[in-house]
Amino acid sequence: MKLTVLALAAMMGVGGMAASVQAAEVPEGPHVVTSGTASVDAVPDMATLTFQVNASAKDAAVAKSQVDQRVAKYFDFLKRNGIDPQDISAANLYTMPEYEYQKDGKSQLKGYRAVRTVQVTLRQLDKLNSLLDGALKANLNEIRSVELGVAKPEVYRDKARQMAIRNAISQAESLAQGFGVTLGPVYSVRYHVSNFQPEPETRMYAAAPSANQTSAAQTYEQQTIHFDDRVEVVFNLSK
């Protein structure tokens, strides 16, 4: 938990603090401005897997058929592994011509390439390695990304927000007490709306001391996701 106190209004002069106070609409009388920030850590409980499959053929329909067959094979694999069909998306498809360029600079149609993207929402992280292996066995050419996340991010967002609020209040109370004045009511609040893009912190899995060989699952990285928030509050002061 982190908290930064900007300053007492009487101490604020120029630069970023002055602009910050103006944005927060400070009163003419004695007041104090605090900026509360908080960070909440969450352990991922889900992952979004993105794969790409592509195939080339003389005919566009043949290339599409090859891609569709690979995707269908992976769909069957996912169903056998208990993945809800609603957590699978592969509706997008595009085809493009492929050209072969001659030494004289001219191009000749070589064939067509079909591409589909498959996205899977995985809610059981212990199946992560299995689903990655299954995709490669189904000839899905590319593993584009593996993004870890949490199923209910709003819970962590709200917790971070409430912690930032409490810290802003706590700092204001501490400052008022230290300067021998009474903390009055809130005059204004400036909330720094966050995009809430969790920042991952990498932690390597540790192999068991007695293990002679590291398992494949242990080579993947576990993340701690940080949800940060900030609120700026102006309080009135009285003697």
Curated annotation (Swiss-Prot):
InterPro entries: 26kDa_periplasmic_antigen, SIMPL/DUF541
Domain of life per record: Bacteria
Residue intervals passing through the bilayer: none
GO biological process: DNA damage response
PANTHER family in UniProt: PERIPLASMIC IMMUNOGENIC PROTEIN, SLR1258 PROTEIN
Protein known as: Uncharacterized protein YggE
